[in-house]
A protein has these predicted regions:
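Non-catalytic substrate-recognition/targeting regions of SAM-dependent transferases
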Residues: 5-24, 29-96, 103
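Conserved SAM/SAH cofactor-binding pocket of Class I
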Residues: 106-133
Length: 133
């Protein structure tokens, strides 16, 4: 199993009661996650001082509530830069667990000895791109 453990700008800080508290660069977000089935106390400071909270609707979907969060911002993973933006369906336009795949194809590109183009199907929005710093 490959583990995405090289992040400096992303981390799951805590999770409880169907939600996870994440740090995306300098901002913290709370988003629902159906895999979080435990009900532990939400003692981390970030639960009270988040920058964005996605509230799931009982009818499906949901909406964001923002606290001092810009419309979009950037985070970095090694030599890659990503633009983030909260979407109406809880996502930010980036799947951090894909970092192991980025590491793998970054090595392949470096060793190809020729220019390479990559289509990132995990980031389909025109503003969500990665580039060398």
């Amino acid at each position: 199993m490959w583990i995405a453990d090289q992040w400096k700008d992303y981390e799951v800080i805590d999770c409880s009661k169907g939600e996870k508290l994440e740090r995306w660069g300098q901002y913290t977000l709370v988003r629902p996650d159906p895999q979080v089935i435990w009900d532990t106390p939400k003692t981390e400071r970030g639960w009270k001082h988040m920058n964005g909270h996605y509230h799931r609707s009982k009818k499906g979907g949901g909406e964001w509530e923002f606290f001092s969060l810009p419309e979009q911002w950037q985070i970095h993973y090694k030599e890659l830069t990503f633009n983030l933006k909260p979407f109406s369906f809880k996502h930010t336009g980036l799947f951090p667990e894909q970092a192991t795949n980025w590491d793998w194809f970054s090595e392949k590109i470096r060793n190809a000895g020729r220019p390479i183009k990559v289509l990132n199907l995990f980031c389909l929005h025109r503003w969500c791109y990665s580039r060398s710093r």
